[in-house]
């Protein structure tokens, strides 16, 4: 906002250097190319993926476990565990077990059936079959001039806000 007040003709590319977003209050990894980010902020419309954050931990006999440490915004941990358990019972996932070891931090542990299962392929399959990966839609609807609903990009939204603050 300060940048636009000082220099109203600031190009979108400069605004994008300042604004790192999207910023969501919980964890997960935002999957969004720079081109798609530019499109969303220019048009006010688009979508992006949020994947859960995970890592593997080695255990005995060459085995490993997948540990989910962050889940996407507005996703219920219990629902994810239920989805994983259903996939295990329906034999859609090569997992032996899923455990919730969470305390104040999220910790969902996935135990593969054997050590030969590729961890990246396993996680990709979990993302595909559960809410460990979800798609978010962006739709920047605002009341233009306080009256007319309209979909605007980032710069027009900020300009509208600056004009509103000048009037109030």
Language-model region placement:
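C-terminal interaction appendages of subunits in large macromolecular complexes
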Residues: 1-168
């Amino acid at each position: 906002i300060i940048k636009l007040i000082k220099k109203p003709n600031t190009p979108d590319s400069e605004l994008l250097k300042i604004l790192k977003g999207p910023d969501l209050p919980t964890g997960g990894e935002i999957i969004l190319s720079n081109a798609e980010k530019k499109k969303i902020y220019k048009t006010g419309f688009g979508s992006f993926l949020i994947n859960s954050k995970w890592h593997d931990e080695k255990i005995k006999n060459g085995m490993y476990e997948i540990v989910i440490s962050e889940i996407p915004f507005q996703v219920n941990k219990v629902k994810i565990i239920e989805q994983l358990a259903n996939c295990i019972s329906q034999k859609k996932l090569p997992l032996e077990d899923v455990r919730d070891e969470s305390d104040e931090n999220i910790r969902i542990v996935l135990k593969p059936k054997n050590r030969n299962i590729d961890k990246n392929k396993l996680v990709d399959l979990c993302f595909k079959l559960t809410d460990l990966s979800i798609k978010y839609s962006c739709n920047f609807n605002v009341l233009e001039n306080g009256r007319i609903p309209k979909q605007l990009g980032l710069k027009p939204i900020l300009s509208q806000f600056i004009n509103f603050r000048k009037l109030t």
